[in-house]
Curated annotation (Swiss-Prot):
Top-rank taxon, per record: Eukaryota
Cellular compartments annotated: Plastid, Chloroplast
Bilayer-spanning residue ranges: none
UniProt-annotated binding residues for [4Fe-4S] cluster: 36
Oligomer and partners: Protochlorophyllide reductase is composed of three subunits; ChlL, ChlN and ChlB. Forms a heterotetramer of two ChlB and two ChlN subunits.
Protein name, entry field: Light-independent protochlorophyllide reductase subunit B
Cofactor: [4Fe-4S] cluster
Listed GO CC annotations: chloroplast
NCBIfam families registered for this protein in UniProt: DPOR_BchB
One biological process term in Gene Ontology: photosynthesis, dark reaction
Length: 513
């Protein structure tokens, strides 16, 4: 355990609550002290939804510590059962309340005797897993619970649908553009003549989980959440799954071809023909997606060789690295992820597309790396946006965790062919246009702008005299930071504490030599 003012992935109970609050008519009870109950506020602030967050905190206070939690937890479960009439109540402790080592499964069993709702305890180790791993595990646990229940009630043996159909697994609350991506995937499947059987957990009903085996295959757009469920369904029901993320022209085509491959196993029997989506891929790539011709335009060629850094969750960071390097000719200096548990897959995906791979959940390491490589643009999470502002480097947000501006009201998917257009816009608009800053300074656009330096350190042991500062301000903005850093580096190496114009020229000569 460590103290941090920023975490890329939150504690395990946040993942469990995200899954529970994504389903319709499911209530979560969080057994936690005050301070751990911020999920309601966070979700209400960020998600553009009208409904209240269905999460109740069962507070661990001094009375609970003195008498034990059973009475209070059982009372909260039965009260919510009577008030809300949910289909399912999920009880989760937090990492703090786990210290009490209470038998919460016993509390759940007690409450289930008097409740009309189903009651389960989230089966998550709060010290071993983070938010994303816990969400993946909880979703699989809920699906397994309801399919086992349907099996016991003998209403599970349903034939697969007559037309090709899919389940979309892993769309959930507070995800990065998840709702827009879901709409785009539904539109894509409609174009291909594929029926969407169920979408879980976002907007899904636990009572409909027994319908999951009716689909021909499962779609897992994001590796972080949904993979465990897809593996369970494959093992128990023989359902194939596609885990390729349809992000970018190349991977969207690969995604559609994988679906075609799986559908054609059943199509000759059930449809009397095989399906062929090649014409659709060609049509979308050449005429619907603007990204293919944009990547050949002079605007995109201006980006060729520009340096970029990519950091985020494994799904988005890997996909973005491949799009930049393969489809846009951008030079990715470093690609990284905070999902340390999936590091091997990430390294395998970005191999050959970037110079350096960074696997860390420490934002200071990411900041230091960005300051060191000095990219022209960053593609990352909310934290990389902050780092970019401090270093005066533009940043495009491509991954959770994000703030309110990345829960847009307008339609902005990142998946599918419309997603390729959004990504092309994001990439192009993230790079500072050549002489823009310099021209603004020349014509008085930024007359109050200070001379900036790209460094994460706020302390400097060097002073610049007025003449050298005036000389520095004459240098164009897009190279000024580099010259300032090189001069300061030269001064430190030679034991100088005050920088003059002469030292600036000496540093320039030393660098050229």
């Amino acid at each position: 355990m460590k103290i941090a003012y920023w975490m890329y992935a939150g504690p395990a109970h946040i993942g469990t609550l995200r899954v529970a609050s994504s389903f319709k008519n499911v209530h979560a009870i969080m057994h936690a002290p005050l301070g751990d109950d911020y999920f309601n506020v966070m979700r209400s602030m960020l998600e553009r939804e009208r409904d209240f967050t269905p999460v109740t905190a069962s507070i661990v206070d001094r009375h609970v510590l003195a008498r034990g939690s059973q009475e209070k937890v059982v009372e909260n479960i039965t009260r919510k059962d009577k008030e809300e009439r949910p289909d399912l109540i999920v009880l989760t402790p937090t990492c703090t309340s786990s210290i009490l080592q209470e038998d919460l499964q016993n509390f759940v069993d007690r409450a289930a005797m008097t409740s009309q709702s189903d009651v389960i305890l989230a089966d998550v180790n709060h010290y071993r897993v983070n938010e994303l791993q816990a969400a993946d595990r909880t979703l699989e646990q809920v699906v397994r619970y309801y399919l086992d229940k349907a099996h016991r009630q003998e209403n599970l043996n349903q034939p697969i649908t007559e037309v090709p159909s899919v389940n979309i697994i892993g769309m959930f609350t507070l995800g990065f553009h998840n709702q827009h991506d879901c709409r785009e995937l539904k539109r894509l499947f409609q174009d291909l003549g594929i029926k969407v059987n169920e979408v879980i957990p976002e907007g899904g009903s636990v009572e409909n989980l027994r319908n999951l085996p009716k689909a021909w295959l499962n779609i897992v757009p994001y590796r972080e959440v949904g993979l465990m469920t897809a593996l369970y369904l494959e093992k128990e029901f023989g359902m194939p799954y596609v885990a390729t993320t349809p992000m970018g022209i190349v991977d969207t085509a690969k995604f559609i071809r994988e679906i075609q491959h799986h559908i054609n196993k059943w199509a000759p029997i059930l449809l009397g023909k095989v399906v062929d989506y090649e014409e659709y891929i060609d049509q979308q790539t050449r005429f619907v997606s603007q990204a293919a011709w944009f990547s050949r335009s002079i605007d995109c060629q201006n980006l060729t060789g520009k340096k970029a850094v990519v950091f985020g969750d494994t799904t988005h960071a890997a996909a973005m690295t491949k799009i930049l390097a393969r489809e846009m000719g951008v030079y990715v200096v470093c690609a990284g992820t905070y999902c340390k548990h999936d590091a091997e897959w990430f390294k395998d995906q970005v191999q050959g597309f970037c110079d350096e791979v960074l696997i860390t959940d420490d934002h200071t390491e990411v900041g230091d790396m960005i300051a060191r490589v000095e990219p022209a643009a960053i593609f990352g999470s909310q934290m990389e946006r902050h780092i970019g502002k401090r270093l005066d480097i533009p940043c495009g947000v491509i991954s959770a965790p994000v703030h309110i501006q990345n829960f847009p009201l307008g339609y902005r998917p990142f998946l599918g062919y419309e997603g390729t257009n959004q990504i092309a816009d994001l990439v192009y608009n993230s790079f500072t246009l050549g002489m823009e800053d310099h021209l603004l300074e020349i014509f008085g656009g930024h007359d109050t702008k200070e001379v900036i330096t790209k460094s994460l350190s706020t302390d400097s042991d060097l002073t610049w005299d007025p003449e050298s500062q005036a000389e520095l301000s004459k240098i164009p903005g897009f190279v000024r930071g580099k010259i300032k850093r090189n001069t300061e580096k030269f001064a430190r190496q030679n034991g100088m504490s005050k920088i003059t114009v002469e030292i600036m020229y000496a540093a320039k000569e030393a660098l050229n030599a």
